[in-house]
Amino acid sequence: FLGPAGVGKSHLAYGIIKSVSDRTKKHAMFIKLPELLARIRNDFGNEANTEQKWIARLSKIPFLVLDDLGQEKISDWSKSILFSILDNRNCTIITSNLASSADIESVYNQAIMDRACKGVDKDHGFRFDGMNSMRRKHY
């Protein structure tokens, strides 16, 4: 889901995975990507929660939403983690304030973009164009 802040991308993504999880009785996880990366970084040196264990756990969750792609501090490390998560998944919803898939590819790389769009053709992505923030009062 791509579009400006406040237009309902996260709300819709949460509603979708909650509905699917409730119907299928399978686990789902909604997490902001910056928060996820902070948790992984905070676990450095913790044998119980290595990067590989985080990635393995996230790979097993049937339905995952990675919220706010592009809001994290982008580094080679964060790109590597994101690549590993997406490379091991099939059903992932991603929300971002970046305007297009080309923007995502330019910020990250083609390999990450390819994995982020796994199983999705160009007609099945959601763009929230021309919408104003729902958080602001409009006069």
Label each region the model flagged.
Residues 25-37:
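Short beta-strand-centered segment that lines the nucleotide-binding/catalytic pocket of NTP-utilizing
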Residues 26-27, 60-63, 88-94:
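Loop/turn-to-beta-strand initiation segments
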